[in-house]
């Protein structure tokens, strides 16, 4: 299908065939994908985020399933966000960490941590066999302005710092997009996933960016439910963004 402004400005969208759902093992899914050959992808990406799309590698997609509308695009309005008690405790628990924004380039230590994370947290989930090529293909876009937000335990007595987690983050003119976060499973008690989002919110504030996009919230999916703990949260209903409503957006 195509969305037309004028012929030279045509925005092409493709609908994929059905494929196994990445969230529910008993369901199939399909997506809408922006034309991956469109040279304007980098410029279109901020607008696509505002339409509920997401990036995976060089693909910009949005779920478009025939019989399921469980995936709800959500974002945090940075200016209105206030951490709750649990999130403040998480920030305090990780106050000893160094947070560094680095270039999105493949490194052996990053891949080793990514592989450990997938092996422990997503065993037999279809991603735990990723090699260095899949790591780069999945997380690093050729046209996106991507950065790695590294969370590190400082070194002492001449020892190097220890990499505990990485939040892959796209930087756009309208906000940050939290693409993927992985961390050392031995430090799961730190709540590094929550800490990463808190740091992305602070990053957006420093840059004067209005939103942090969290991808999709899915009712009843344990690994996605943490997103609604950030208040306020905005949800996209296919036409506009509005304050998240647990009953309404549960579809």
Swiss-Prot record:
The keyword Transferase applies. Belongs to the R-transferase family. Bpt subfamily. One of its GO terms (cellular component) is cytoplasm. It is an enzyme of class 2 (transferase). Functions in the N-end rule pathway of protein degradation where it conjugates Leu from its aminoacyl-tRNA to the N-termini of proteins containing an N-terminal aspartate or glutamate. GO terms for biological process: ubiquitin-dependent protein catabolic process via the N-end rule pathway. It comes from Stenotrophomonas maltophilia (strain K279a). It holds the Pfam family ATE_C. It is found in: Cytoplasm. One of its GO terms (molecular function) is arginyl-tRNA--protein transferase activity. This is Aspartate/glutamate leucyltransferase. Its EC number is 2.3.2.29. It catalyses: N-terminal L-glutamyl-[protein] + L-leucyl-tRNA(Leu) = N-terminal L-leucyl-L-glutamyl-[protein] + tRNA(Leu) + H(+); N-terminal L-aspartyl-[protein] + L-leucyl-tRNA(Leu) = N-terminal L-leucyl-L-aspartyl-[protein] + tRNA(Leu) + H(+). Keywords: Acyltransferase, Cytoplasm, Transferase.
């Amino acid at each position: 299908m195509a969305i037309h402004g004028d012929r030279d400005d045509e925005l092409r969208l493709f609908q994929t065939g059905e494929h196994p759902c990445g969230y529910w093992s008993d369901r199939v899914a399909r997506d809408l994908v922006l034309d991956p050959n469109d040279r304007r992808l980098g410029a279109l990406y901020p607008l696509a985020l505002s339409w509920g799309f997401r990036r995976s590698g060089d693909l910009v997609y949005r779920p478009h399933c025939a019989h399921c509308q469980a995936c709800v695009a959500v974002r945090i309005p940075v200016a209105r966000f206030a951490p709750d008690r649990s999130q403040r405790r998480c920030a305090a628990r990780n106050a000893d960490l160094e947070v560094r924004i680095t270039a999105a380039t493949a490194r052996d230590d990053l891949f080793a941590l990514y592989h450990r994370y997938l092996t422990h947290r997503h065993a037999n989930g279809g991603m735990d066999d990723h090699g260095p090529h899949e790591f780069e293909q999945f997380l690093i876009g050729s046209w996106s302005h991507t950065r790695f937000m590294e969370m590190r335990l400082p070194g002492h007595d001449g020892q190097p710092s220890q990499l505990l987690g990485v939040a892959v983050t796209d930087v756009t003119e309208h906000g940050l997009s939290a693409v993927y976060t992985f961390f050392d499973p031995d430090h799961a008690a730190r709540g590094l996933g929550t800490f990463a989002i808190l740091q992305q919110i602070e990053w957006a504030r420093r840059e004067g960016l209005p939103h942090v996009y969290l991808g999709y919230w899915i009712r009843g999916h344990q690994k996605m439910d943490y997103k609604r703990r950030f208040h306020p949260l905005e949800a996209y209903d296919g036409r506009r963004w509005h304050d998240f409503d647990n009953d309404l957006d549960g579809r």
